[in-house]
A protein has these predicted regions:
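Glycine-centered tight beta-turn/hairpin loop motif at sheet-sheet or coil-to-beta transitions
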Residues: 70-72
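Conserved beta-strand scaffold positions in the cores of enzyme catalytic domains, especially
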Residues: 64, 117-119, 405-407
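Catalytic active-site module of serine/aspartate enzymes centered on a nucleophile-bearing elbow/loop
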Residues: 402-437
Length: 437
């Protein structure tokens, strides 16, 4: 049975006002680094002025609240299993364009299995505060190592020294994976969903003794240049996501934000029968052009126009059990309030797009994920194969203790929402077999 999530109510400051206060206090660019504890404690919002969270669709036993002093932010979380102190923790990290809400169908079962289940709105998303919502503010705080600090700080703020399992879906997968790679003492096991983890980038090795230099990977810009030569011309979606105009394109979609989310989620789900993913031979324009247009877009279209033709019919919408109209409205309401800029910032500093991020990651060259790990995705999810070779790297080198690789029937990209019972079963069995509190 669903109920309205409870929320905490505190003082009312906007993100931009907080930045101004930080600058006035001589603290420099608040968005560029974690703030002082004193400042972080003031990063609040008046939740009573926001629409009730979850549109009445939050399952029984899940609560919504704010957690202050988390790497310079006040983080909004959903949590379950909080009633009993001392439970081992499970941390769930969502993707794009998602929210903590995306884990609503997974959390009750994990709590019933004996865990304190924590799902935050990640930096840039939803009701989490403490980041600048301006494109011009820059994306440095969204680099992967700072997002990893976010995860550690949240775990500590909630009174845990470790978590039994960290789970990351889509854009949350690299955060979860890097967390397990860097701090295996905290993140004791790992579940990767949808986006395979290729491992830390490699530094040249043994070159002083004549070993060849590493062959550079095809960059997104190089791929885009080749995609533009196709007929019709195409472009890689992550380059689009990095543009200034991506926020307005989606936020002000001509079809309306609710219809945008409905079409976007349908197009990437198993319900769209055109999703028939398979391994690609390489990261060439010809191979990548086989991927649907939500990943390899038509060059002259934004995402709103890309998904508009894939709006499902009314009878499908009325009978869609995994994503009801009330649930779609939760996403439309939250993103309608915040926009997409914060959620898109991570794409600007992804590996391969930002030299400074790559330089930071090179610190961990040669390091592997050694905690127990598993991979879960939908069988109809092109996210598995959109980066050719990534699955093999994850299974053969990035993770030394990969104990499960699961592609689920009847699921596309939104695996934990499309097939929650199967996902729950895999997560709980994995915890029983491999996780250490």
């Amino acid at each position: 049975m669903a109920k309205q999530a409870t929320v905490d109510t505190t003082s009312n400051f906007s993100r931009r006002a907080l930045l101004a206060r930080a600058a006035a206090a001589g603290l420099g660019s608040f968005a560029m680094a974690p703030s002082s504890p004193a400042l972080a404690a003031t990063v609040r919002t008046d939740f009573s002025k926001l629409p009730p969270y979850g549109n009445g669709t939050i399952p029984e036993g899940i609560r919504s609240r704010q957690v202050a002093n988390v790497n310079g932010m006040t983080v909004h979380i959903l949590e379950a299993g909080y009633e009993t102190p001392g439970r081992p923790a499970v941390l769930l990290l969502h993707g794009f364009p998602e929210l903590a809400y995306s884990w609503r169908k997974v959390m009750p079962s994990l709590a019933a299995a004996g865990y304190h289940v924590i799902a935050p709105d990640q930096r840039g998303y939803g009701r989490t505060l403490g980041w600048d919502d301006s494109y011009d503010a820059g994306a440095d705080p969204f680099r992967i190592l700072n997002m990893t600090r976010d995860a550690i700080a949240l775990v500590y703020a909630l009174g845990h020294r470790s978590v039994a399992m960290v789970v990351g879906h889509d854009a949350g997968a690299p955060v979860a994976s890097w967390s397990a790679l860097i701090r295996p003492d905290i993140f004791r096991s790992l579940t990767i969903m949808s986006s395979p983890f290729e491992g830390a980038p490699s530094l040249p090795f043994d070159t002083a003794n004549g070993a060849p230099l590493l062959r550079p990977a095809v960059t997104d810009d190089e791929l885009d240049a080749e995609l533009a030569k196709l007929n019709p011309p195409r472009k890689y979606y992550q380059n689009y996501q990095r543009t200034r105009g991506a926020n307005d394109d989606m936020l002000h979609a001509p079809q309306g934000l609710h219809a945008f989310f409905r079409a976007y989620y349908f197009y990437k789900s198993a319900d769209f029968k055109g999703n028939k993913p398979h391994p690609l031979k390489g990261r060439t324009a010809e191979e990548m052009a086989q991927i649907p247009t939500y990943y390899v877009m038509e060059k002259d279209k934004g995402m709103a126009a890309t998904v508009a033709p894939f709006m499902p019919p009314a009878d499908y919408i009325a009978n869609c059990k995994w994503l009801t109209e009330a649930e779609v409205e939760v996403y439309a309401t939250e993103y309608g309030r915040t926009g997409f800029t914060g959620a898109l910032q991570g794409y600007r500093v992804r590996r391969g797009s930002d030299p400074r991020s790559i330089a930071e990651m090179h610190t961990f060259s040669g390091r592997t994920i050694d905690v127990p790990a598993q991979y879960i995705a939908g069988k109809s999810d092109w996210g598995v194969y959109q980066t050719p070779g990534a699955v093999d790297k994850m299974r053969n080198s990035a993770c030394t203790h990969m104990v499960g690789f699961h592609l689920l029937e009847g699921a596309g990209h939104w695996v934990q929402q499309e097939q929650p019972e199967m996902v729950n079963s895999l997560l709980i069995q994995f915890l029983r077999d491999y996780a250490k509190p």
